[in-house]
């Protein structure tokens, strides 16, 4: 792992993330080569129209999908690794070598004098292929190991931390009245540490507050489910944590015995938020948490997330399609279009100097509260075929200004830099 991946300020790093789905012989590239990083304590907004791949990106990060290729690093440790890119590279390498060998054999058949030299070239090509395939197989093995065992390594670290904390205290408490209580506390902490998974440090708030809650479970059972799964059996402790979290999200402890159908949409979303934050996560993925709510309730939920961010030191990946909401809540914003990241910048920079035509189109669609200004608002219609010429020069995500990335080719990069006066 390189030094960059160990940067303590970077909580999550997504590298070349691809998430493809196959259906009836067709491959749907839902997320295609997406790169970004999220720093500790910030809100990173991910925006785009419906179907652009933003929700799939969030679900891939939390391992609800097995990613096709790419890497996802969390707290300096690889938690997701796809292998399809290595498989494709191995296939391409085999084909290239086979074509070269066939060409050399045809040349040797046509001119026997070149046979000895060509045989040496063939042996060299086959040796190179063997070395390349061995390297790719090792990459695949390492990727599969990290994908499967990242939780085990994290649990081992937690167990070591618990032992380092409690063993000296237990030694000092030998023969004292408090020894039994300390032993019990140590065993409980050790049991929880052994069952803790790194992925539990990432929690998700789902878009639909109705569908994401089990109608047969009480609010107490819904919120405490994560604690129970992680081995906590002390019912008094669980109840106290549930009551504490309910009050934190603006509900009361009497709500703990009720069922989801007894709540309004905003209250259900608060229950969903409580379920996520009771696990004390470091990263919260909020998948359009306000899109199904009324405007007045949206403001309440956004304010609640802001309060929780400050109180619990949360880092938030905020997925939305409403740029007016994202603007006031996010520190940085990434814009997605058809599975690609087309622009990434700070919130202020993106709204002040949008560069990609699709970003300009999204911003022009935001309605203005002043009716006179609304009448003068000009819509920008994005047409990918007309707005770009990628016939010879293909685009990539480039840093056209410090911290401002745009998907463009060489000609567009020069134009964007000129727009910014660089």
Language-model regions, residue ranges each:
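A short, proline-enriched helix->beta-strand linker immediately N-terminal to the Walker B motif
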Residues: 278-282, 298
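Conserved ABC ATPase "signature" region
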Residues: 237-254
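The feature captures the beta-strand-to-loop junction immediately N-terminal to the Walker
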Residues: 47-48
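Conserved ABC transporter NBD signature motif
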Residues: 70-81, 162-166, 171-173, 178-186
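Short catalytic/signature loops enriched in Gly
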Residues: 2-11, 27, 81-87, 107-108, ...
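Conserved ABC ATPase signature
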Residues: 259-263, 267
């Amino acid at each position: 792992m390189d030094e960059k991946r160990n940067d303590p300020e970077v909580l999550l790093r997504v590298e070349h993330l691809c998430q493809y789905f196959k259906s009836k012989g067709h491959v749907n590239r839902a997320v295609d080569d997406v790169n970004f990083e999220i720093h500790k304590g910030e809100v990173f907004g991910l925006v785009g129209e419906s179907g652009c791949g933003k929700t799939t990106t969030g679900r891939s990060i939390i391992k609800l999908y097995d990613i096709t290729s790419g890497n996802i690093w969390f707290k300096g440790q690889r938690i997701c690794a796809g292998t399809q890119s290595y498989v494709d590279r191995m296939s391409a390498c085999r084909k290239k070598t086979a074509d070269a060998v066939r060409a050399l054999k045809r040349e040797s058949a046509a001119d026997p004098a070149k046979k000895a030299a060509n045989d040496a070239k063939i042996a060299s090509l086959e040796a190179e292929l063997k070395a390349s395939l061995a390297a790719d197989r090792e990459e695949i093995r390492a990727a599969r190991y990290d994908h499967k065992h990242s939780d085990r390594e994290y649990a081992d670290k937690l167990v070591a931390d618990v032992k380092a904390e409690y063993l000296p205290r237990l030694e000092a408490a030998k023969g004292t009245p408090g020894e039994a209580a300390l032993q019990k506390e140590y065993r409980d902490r050790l049991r929880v540490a052994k069952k803790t998974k790194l992925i539990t440090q990432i929690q998700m708030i789902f878009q639909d507050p109705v569908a994401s809650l089990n109608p047969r479970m009480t609010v107490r059972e819904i919120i405490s489910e994560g604690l129970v799964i992680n081995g906590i059996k002390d019912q008094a402790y669980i109840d106290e944590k549930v009551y504490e979290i309910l009050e934190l999200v603006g509900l009361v402890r009497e709500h703990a015995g009720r069922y989801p159908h007894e709540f309004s949409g905003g209250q259900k979303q608060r229950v969903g938020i409580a379920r996520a934050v009771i696990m004390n996560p470091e990263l919260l993925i909020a998948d359009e948490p306000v899109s199904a709510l009324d405007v007045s309730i949206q403001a309440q939920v956004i304010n609640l997330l802001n309060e929780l961010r400050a109180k619990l030191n949360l880092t938030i990946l905020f997925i939305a399609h409403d740029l007016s909401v994202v603007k006031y809540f996010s520190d940085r914003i990434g814009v997605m279009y058809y599975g690609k990241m087309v622009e990434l910048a700070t919130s202020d920079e993106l709204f002040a100097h949008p560069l990609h035509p699709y970003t300009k189109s999204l911003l022009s669609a935001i309605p203005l509260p002043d009716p006179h200004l609304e009448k003068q608002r000009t819509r920008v219609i994005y047409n990918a075929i007309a707005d770009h010429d990628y016939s010879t020069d293909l685009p990539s995500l480039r840093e056209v200004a410090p911290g401002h990335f745009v998907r463009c080719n060489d000609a567009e990069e020069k134009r964007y830099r000129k727009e910014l006066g660089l």
